[in-house]
Regions:
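Mobile genetic element proteins and their domesticated derivatives, centered on retroelements
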Residues: 1, 37, 53, 59, ...
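Basic, flexible linker segments flanking DNA-binding modules
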Residues: 1-36, 98, 105, 109-115, ...
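Mobile-element integrase/transposase regions
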Residues: 6-55, 60, 72-76, 84-89, ...
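Short small-residue beta-strand/loop micro-motif enriched in glycine and branched aliphatics
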Residues: 60-64, 126-128, 152
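A short acidic/small-residue loop/turn micro-motif
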Residues: 67-71
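RNase H-like two-metal-ion nuclease catalytic core shared by retroviral integrases
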Residues: 94-96, 104-118, 123-147, 158-167, ...
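C-terminal domain-tail junction helix/linker
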Residues: 121-123, 144-221
Length: 221
């Protein structure tokens, strides 16, 4: 019977409706929707907090290393992200950590400083569902990418060594790494394609590096 079916091009029964699960597609957004998260990295000198932001659409990444990860540091990170990005940031997505939002029990607390920075700049602040970290998967993947290229591959005596390597990696990622999700473009080239104006990219507080490419006035915008 099997050979008979093969001879007539019927080697298997047709799929019936509902056999294959339908995968929901992510909603597309214009550039300016950033996923933000905090991770931890280690050097011989001690631990640092890695603040990471990545644009959902352009994949442009912005990172900083800090000794602490409090709400004031998070608010400062957001302000510098806004300064570094040449286009309007309309939405940020974070988890429910105290760096980004008040706890549910803090009913008498003032409006969170991170939320105030969002309001001051016309940014919608969205939160992931509690105990659903995968809803912020884009930045989780970027965290892994950064760690695999830095602390999981190299040994750093000092924080400054890690900062310099991280700065070089993020610059190479934004300006030289071609991504399948961008149809072979780099994040920089994709943003240029959008017809925007100016961008200045730097990983703070890393010291200036002559090998790190920066965008400024007179770039493709």
């Amino acid at each position: 019977l099997h050979r008979f079916l093969q001879r007539h091009g019927i080697s298997r029964l047709p799929d019936t409706e509902g056999d294959k699960p339908k995968h929901a597609k992510f909603k597309t957004y214009p550039i300016g929707y950033f996923h933000i998260d905090i991770a931890e990295v280690q050097a011989a000198e001690g631990k640092l907090r890695l603040f990471v932001a990545i644009d959902r659409t352009s994949k442009f990444a912005f990172v900083e290393l800090h000794q602490q990860a409090g709400k004031m540091v998070a608010a400062g990170f957001l302000r510098r992200l806004i300064e570094a990005v040449p286009y309007k940031i309309h939405t940020v997505l974070t988890d429910n950590g105290i760096q980004f939002t008040n706890r549910a029990c803090d009913i008498y607390a003032f409006h969170h400083i991170f939320g105030r920075v969002c309001d001051e700049n016309g940014i919608e602040h969205r939160l992931t569902k509690v105990k659903h970290p995968w809803t912020n998967g884009q930045v989780e993947r970027m965290n892994r990418t950064i760690k695999e290229a830095t602390v999981k591959r190299s040994y750093y005596e000092t924080h400054d060594q890690l900062r310099r390597h991280l700065s070089d990696f993020v610059a190479a990622y934004n300006f030289a790494r071609r991504l399948k999700t961008l149809r072979g473009l780099t994040p920089y080239a994709f943003i240029c394609q959008q017809g925007k104006k100016t961008i200045t990219v730097q990983t703070k507080p890393a010291p200036p590096n002559p090998k790190t490419k920066q965008l400024g006035r007179g770039s493709c915008w």
